[in-house]
Amino acid sequence: MQTNSSLLNLDVIQIQHYQQNRYPMLFIDFVKEALPGKYAKGYKNFSFNEWFFPAHFADEPNVPGFVQVEMLTQMFLMTFLTLPGNKEKKTSFVSISNAQFKRKIVPGERVDIESTLSFYSRGVAKGKSVGTING
């Protein structure tokens, strides 16, 4: 849903119009605000029934690192896939720098994600994503 001429607000169905990730690999629930070519803000809610919790780990469920990286990456994708002509383009990443995991994410928590795009040219993007737990 477009809120003005350039600022976007997207639910999970609308997100799928921009990127190719689908269940069980879609790890963002809502894009609260996206300014194409600049930034995207949104969140992911983790409920106890996520497919990975029974295996990671039964006695102390927490979100696997690869899911956390993918979640941050998917919000970053929204900074440039929302640009005209980029809808549903296939993407891949070459490197991740300075990744830090401060603590476990457990069932019932929400991760708020802010991504900024610092460079985009000829299909190559560079930027930053930060996730904070429960605001």
What are these regions (language model features)?
Residues 31, 96-134:
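Hydrophobic beta-sheet segments that form the core/acyl-binding groove
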Residues 2-9, 75-114:
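Hydrophobic beta-strand-centered segment that forms part of the acyl-chain substrate-binding groove
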Residues 31, 62-87:
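Active-site helix/loop of acyl-thioester processing domains in fatty-acid/polyketide metabolism
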